[in-house]
From Swiss-Prot:
<dbReference type="InterPro" id="IPR013114">
    <property type="entry name" value="FabA_FabZ"/>
</dbReference>
<keyword id="KW-0443">Lipid metabolism</keyword>
<dbReference type="GO" id="GO:0019171">
    <property type="term" value="F:(3R)-hydroxyacyl-[acyl-carrier-protein] dehydratase activity"/>
</dbReference>
<dbReference type="GO" id="GO:0005737">
    <property type="term" value="C:cytoplasm"/>
</dbReference>
<dbReference type="GO" id="GO:0034017">
    <property type="term" value="F:trans-2-decenoyl-acyl-carrier-protein isomerase activity"/>
</dbReference>
<comment type="subunit">
    <text>Homodimer.</text>
</comment>
<dbReference type="Pfam" id="PF07977">
    <property type="entry name" value="FabA"/>
</dbReference>
<comment type="function">
    <text>Necessary for the introduction of cis unsaturation into fatty acids. Catalyzes the dehydration of (3R)-3-hydroxydecanoyl-ACP to E-(2)-decenoyl-ACP and then its isomerization to Z-(3)-decenoyl-ACP. Can catalyze the dehydratase reaction for beta-hydroxyacyl-ACPs with saturated chain lengths up to 16:0, being most active on intermediate chain length.</text>
</comment>
<feature type="active site">
    <location>
        <position position="70"/>
    </location>
</feature>
<dbReference type="GO" id="GO:0006636">
    <property type="term" value="P:unsaturated fatty acid biosynthetic process"/>
</dbReference>
<keyword id="KW-0413">Isomerase</keyword>
<comment type="pathway">
    <text>Lipid metabolism; fatty acid biosynthesis.</text>
</comment>
<dbReference type="InterPro" id="IPR010083">
    <property type="entry name" value="FabA"/>
</dbReference>
<keyword id="KW-0456">Lyase</keyword>
<keyword id="KW-0276">Fatty acid metabolism</keyword>
<protein>
    <recommendedName>
        <fullName>3-hydroxydecanoyl-[acyl-carrier-protein] dehydratase</fullName>
        <ecNumber>4.2.1.59</ecNumber>
        <ecNumber>5.3.3.14</ecNumber>
    </recommendedName>
</protein>
<keyword id="KW-0275">Fatty acid biosynthesis</keyword>
Length: 171
């Protein structure tokens, strides 16, 4: 599939099935762990560092699986799922930019939570700015990101790191 500047849910599902970047290359999670419904924009030279930018969205539906179990009587989307979504997007960016291998989260420098995602929300927006993209034996991306709910920033992450690995058996 040729790289595009935006992707639908159907495209993202194909990525999860390994049909976007080729067999053995970057995949998004499938089913319930895919934390976005669309990528509205992805660029190779956007963002304040000129290294790339990604914007994606998740439509909130009160019937989403995590609201039933986190927490009973006090439903809130787990913050770790928003963090994972940002890692998913850094990995997607690396595959989109031609990187070979399977993505693995390598860490994050700092995370701040200043709000929550409730079942009454309408939309979550993820915004990532690539700070560094290493294209050597190891493909690795470093990005800063935010999670917004209905236009308000509620999570901030600095130095999200994802690498692509040809062999994950020793990881």
């Amino acid at each position: 599939m040729e790289p595009k500047n935006s992707y639908t849910k159907e495209d993202l599902i194909l990525c999860g099935e390994g049909k976007m970047f080729g067999e053995g290359n970057c995949r998004l999670p499938s089913d319930n762990m895919l934390m976005m419904d669309r990528i509205t924009s992805i660029t190779a030279d956007g963002g304040i560092h000129g290294k790339g930018e990604i914007v994606a969205e998740l439509d909130i539906d009160p019937s989403l699986w995590f609201f039933d179990c986190h927490f009973k009587g006090d439903p809130v989307m787990p913050g770790c799922l928003g963090l994972d979504a940002m890692w998913q997007l850094v990995g997607f960016y690396l595959g989109w930019s031609g990187g070979p291998g399977l993505g693995r989260a390598l860490g994050v420098g700092e995370v701040k939570f200043t709000g929550q995602i409730l079942p009454t929300a309408k939309k979550v927006t993820y915004r990532l700015v690539m700070k560094r993209v290493i294209k050597r034996k190891l493909f690795m991306g470093v990005a800063d990101g935010t999670v917004e709910v209905d236009g308000r920033v509620i999570y901030e992450a600095k130095d999200l790191k994802v690498g692509l690995f040809q062999d994950t058996s020793a990881f």
